[in-house]
Amino acid sequence: MLRAVLQANKNGVPLSKLQAEYKSFTGEPIPFKDMGFHALDAYLKSIPSVVRIEVSRVGEVICYAVVCKETARIAALVAHQRSSKKKSGGQVNCQMRLKYTAPVSHFGKPKATLRQPGFTPPQEKIIRKPVPTSAWGKGNTFGSRTFEYSPPPIPQLFGIAPIQMHLPNINRPERKVTLPPRFQREVNSFLNPTPMTDSNANHTQSLKSVVPGSGQPRCDLSVIQNNLKELLNKHSNGLWLSKLPQLYKETYKQDLGGEMLKQVPSWTHICMVQKLVTMGHTEMVLYSTAIKQPSFTKNVQNHSNNQAKPNVPVDSTPSSPPLQSSGNIPKDELKQKISKVLTKYSNGLWYHALPKVFEDMFKQKLPTEVLNLDSLTDICTVDLISEEPFKAILYAKSAERANQNSNPSVNNNIPQKLQDRESPLLPEEPEMNMTPPPLVIPSEASPSVLVVELSSTNDVVIRYIGRDYSAAQEHMEDEMKDFCSKSSTAKIGFLRVGQLVAAKAEEDVWLRAQISAIEGKKVKVCYVDYGFSEIVDITKVCKLGKQFYTLPFQATKCRLAGLEAFCDDSIIIKALELKACGKILAVEILEKSEKPLVVLYDTSGDDDININAACLKELCDRSLSLQLKANSSFSNVIVTNVCSDGTLFCQLPSKGLAKLYETLQKVDSEFQSKQVTSHLYVSLPFCGKICLYHYKGKWARVEITSVHSSRALDVQFLDSGTIASVKVSELKEIPPPLLRDLISIPPQALRCCLADLPLRIGMWTPDAVLWLRNTVLNCLECSIRVVKVDEATNMVHIYLFTSNNFPDLERSINRQITNEELWKHQKDVFLNLSASTLESSRGGGAQASELSPPGLCKDHTSAVKKPDMQQSSSVPSFNMPPPLPLPRPGEHMDVFVSVACHPGHFVCQPWQELHKLEVVMEEMLLHYSTTEEKPVALEKNKLYAAKVENKWYRVLVKGILTNGLVSVYELDYGRHELVSCRKVQPLIEKFMQLPFQAITSQLAGVSCEHWSEEASIVFRNHVEKKPLVALVQTIHESTHPWDRRAVAYIVDTSLPDTDIWIHELMTEYHIQLSKPE
């Protein structure tokens, strides 16, 4: 199956995405650990007959399939499945066209026009029509990608591009974060871009403004001409025609129409026109008729020189003292002397220095008329440097070139290469003002990036990895190689600082580059798609064709969240270079801006590593860390937390603990002395951020571990090890004066385990955990003896003693807990102990788990006794929530598919109600995380609130198992889960107002009763976790809302020009599957 998945991807599958790709088709990840391999790449290297591994140009590891005829048919089916999963284009299709179905086992046809679930407002229809198709939009596939120049306006076009992939918060695969209001406004600006105007309409409008007899107000021609005279007199050194409209508007607060601008060169009584040919295109300079017009060579070329400056065409002429001729010098002789001067200065001679140098060399003054550069075009070329003051460099022409100018017949004797190099380029469309469009930040939740280099945490150069980014760039570079190697027009004859060119790098690769300096025959270029600079020979620089301006520069900068205060710290920079540079990482984008604020994650190992948090920990003062050794003993130890697997967190007396108390007192004084303002509170929470939380009258350091919404999140107390759910509004930023002091103190919670007890046995029994918590958490003074320090797992093996039992090992907690019959209890403690007993035994710390450790557990088959209803609270009695209103047959609704088993069973949620469900779940999280647990007498088919993966859901209990687990059905999402009975709490009436959101559904239009696993995978990949449109065929009502069932057509309307009817796709799949091989 692995080979088939790889064969369906002709361009290979990145190693970082292979697991997800494999799971999307099979439903399971590659079980490489079960086969004895520690990493996926190690397993792939062991099967060279199936997988071929290569490293791409950008350093990404790509996996390719080794061809096998046996899997060709499976690969074809996978490829067919993939073909209908193309990403959408730059626009969103808000209207679904009526499409007649094929007569193959269909029962009915859709009869309504449907709409795409809430992406764009109605004005999107107006925006879409004049928008040209984007060559770099997401609708293009990699194989058919073209790089044609798209005319402006570019910013509006790219404002629309991200709309298609921006799904709601509920559809994010990981780290579901509800955006704060200030960030939500920014997203709304992407979803509601400013409507674009038709450039043709603007042009027509400008024409009407100057056409006589039109209905528009007619401009006074004499006023415009007088204004132009004033401008040209002010700019006696000349004025670019292309700059005239802007200057005119700034001076006279009026627009100079495009048609009027075309007429300006023909007004010979007002201005004179000088045409210049630079870089193969023609520019015009205007001069007042009252000022003598300077002349420049029409074929301006560039020569390498040691005084390289930006080559900007000039507007001004030098003011030089009047020179008198030294007699009647023949013209040819004068040119020969000037040629000798220029030949002596092989790197060029400044124009204003020519008279002085000529006089020093020949003891004669240079005639004034010679300063007209038109008369020197046959012996020198001119490099125009700046406008004000006038600067130009003169270069001597070769003898062959001078002869060529004087005698065209000599061309036959000149080598063809020389003629090609020095032949003037034909005028063409100017490219010096062309700029690529801005880089659009990917809309996916966690895009991949390659970290190129960094000089500060606020200036980290990255490149996005993906089809529309690195893959598109590789395709463009292949085209650049063909263009620069074969096209004769690609040769460049004029260089300037800041110019975009194509530069030849190693391995015969051509890259886009920007010139940053010119020194002799060497050019320093910055590769704009990679973010680093290099010095190359001038012969390796080529003209950048306009087709290569369509792709945005791929190298961009970002800021690392949480490291702003230490952006230039050498320790942070060194750690970041070691952990991130040259690696492909996942990125979580917190703020989308010109320089995004991000969190980097290394996902190459078994666990995701937060690079930002890992670098921040490098600031810890090692001198404050505990130096633990085997057989060392400590007294006055405080046990701060007991976890459900028997892990303990302890605080030992140390210099670090003393400094922590002292610094936290300063924090308290700082907050009391200042007025409470908004900047003291955490405004942008993210995983790995360290902040302060006020707990039991004292400030404590906490690290954010999970963000549930804009109001609720999970934190871990750094100095006690406790995990809790808190409100965002309860967190405060560390005061800047004390930030480094608090960060430098190592966490004071020492992670320990009891020696001589089995490790990695899973969760302890609830009775054992509760006994341990009751014994050690209430003891003010404990003692420990260190047995072993495991640095690999950051675990300390200890013997734990209460205050009166040290150092007798037989009376240690380790011995007492094994002597107790705590491991025999398999029934959940809440179902067998009275509420008063539980309340008296409850302590602080993390929740105890529900599972029994295998190996210590002996009674696996004991039955659960019926709970005593008098000993625990029962479910409150109140009315059911109102039933969810469903459309009638023939009507449609926008839905989100939360669960998809097969076409005969999937679960939908009403799209328009999702935001209400998010609010309810957020309130449930805050309510149950801040209230004390209650013992609950669980009953089958009753409603409760249950905690599943750090979130609370409204559930229906389906069964109670003998090992303390409860089978529940999520009434809003349609999933079945197993949870600990201690994670089930009464569902209060406050959370019963919203109708249950899960709609059990069946696909209409298909007749198959039994679906194969392969067909189920195809169906799941096309509908699960996606916003779709449902056309209801039948509603089967029932007494209970969770037993209602809908039969509906499902349609994917996300593509710009195609609607995917899921029942048609499944029917076609069955036909393909039933064909003979």
Curated annotation (Swiss-Prot):
Give the Polar residues compositional bias ranges: 300-328
Ranges annotated as biased composition (Basic and acidic residues): 857-868
PROSITE patterns per record: HTH_OST, TUDOR
Q: Where in the cell is it found?
A: Cytoplasm
**Region annotation (Disordered) ranges:** 300-331, 841-883
Gene Ontology cellular component?
A: cytoplasm; ribonucleoprotein granule
Keyword set, alphabetical order = Cytoplasm, Differentiation, Repeat, RNA-binding, Spermatogenesis
- Biological process GO terms, please? lens fiber cell development; lens fiber cell differentiation; lens morphogenesis in camera-type eye; post-transcriptional regulation of gene expression; spermatogenesis
Q: Which domain of life is it from?
A: Eukaryota
Please classify the protein's predominant subcellular localization into one broad category.
cytoplasm
Q: Where would I find the HTH OST-type domain in this sequence?
A: 1-67, 220-289, 330-398
SUPFAM superfamilies, A to Z: Tudor/PWWP/MBT
Q: Supply one GO molecular-function term.
A: mRNA binding
Residue intervals of the Tudor domain = 494-551, 684-741
Q: What is the role of this chain?
A: Component of specific cytoplasmic RNA granules involved in post-transcriptional regulation of specific genes: probably acts by binding to specific mRNAs and regulating their translation. Probably required during spermatogenesis.
Which family, according to UniProt? Belongs to the TDRD7 family.
**PANTHER family named among the record's database cross-references:** FI20010P1-RELATED, TUDOR DOMAIN CONTAINING PROTEIN
Q: What is this protein called?
A: Tudor domain-containing protein 7
Q: What organism is the protein native to?
A: Xenopus tropicalis (Western clawed frog)
The encoding gene is: tdrd7
